[in-house]
């Protein structure tokens, strides 16, 4: 079983990937690229899965993040095999990941 620190580092890695790949990308380029759509979706799934496995007590004492929302997004992506809303994926990456990364960095630094 992975430690909380390892799980947070997984989340950070995926945030880094999403931020790096979306940096010089516009919405249409993202939507036109099947590879990027799949990669971004997978990264969000990994973030959600890692967040689900972080202990409840840790989440309670570190409530700056929407842990439930991260896990919920993962569930939506996992269970909608043929109908992933890539507009939603794009919006999440562009509106939430940067702030999530800042908080995750702080948590990793506290535990490391």
How should these model regions be labeled?
Residues 1-112:
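Solvent-exposed interaction patches of small proteins and small membrane subunits
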């Amino acid at each position: 079983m992975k430690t909380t620190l390892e799980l947070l580092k997984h989340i950070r890695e995926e945030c880094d990937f999403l931020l790096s790949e979306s940096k010089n990308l516009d919405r249409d380029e993202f939507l036109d690229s099947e590879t990027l759509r799949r990669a971004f979706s997978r990264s969000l799934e990994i973030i959600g899965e890692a967040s689900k496995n972080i202990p409840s007590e840790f989440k309670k004492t570190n409530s700056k993040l929407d842990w439930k929302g991260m896990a919920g997004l993962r569930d939506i992506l996992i269970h909608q095999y043929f109908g992933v809303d890539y507009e939603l994926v794009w919006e999440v990456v562009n509106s939430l990941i940067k702030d999530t990364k800042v908080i995750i960095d702080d948590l990793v630094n506290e535990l490391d």
